[in-house]
Amino acid sequence: MNNLIIIAVASWLVLGALCKKDGYPYDGNNCKYDCWKNQYCDDLCKKKKGASGYCYALNLSCYCYGLPDKEKTSVKTKCYKGR
């Protein structure tokens, strides 16, 4: 019985860690979301099912916490903004 409880708790911890990630969300053109205000990014991240977000001042891009695994937080192709 104790082993079953340990396995259940370990599985819950692993699934919780694997289901959420932090990073810069990307749009359909593989571009980061530009920003000036934290509230815009927080709203964007929550819309994407994240926990919260803010505007990272050094690159003026939204950064999100707690995004689902299916959400893109890195891309291998260039941003195609304006094409």
Swiss-Prot record:
GO BP terms: defense response
Database matches in InterPro entries: LCN-type_CS_alpha_beta_dom (IPR044062), Scorpion_toxin-like (IPR003614), Scorpion_toxin-like_sf (IPR036574), Scorpion_toxinL (IPR018218), Scorpion_toxinL/defensin (IPR002061)
Tissue: Expressed by the venom gland.
Domain of life according to the entry: Eukaryota
GO cellular component: extracellular region
Family: Belongs to the long (4 C-C) scorpion toxin superfamily. Sodium channel inhibitor family. Alpha subfamily.
Record protein name field: Neurotoxin LmNaTx30
The organism of origin for this protein: Lychas mucronatus (Chinese swimming scorpion)
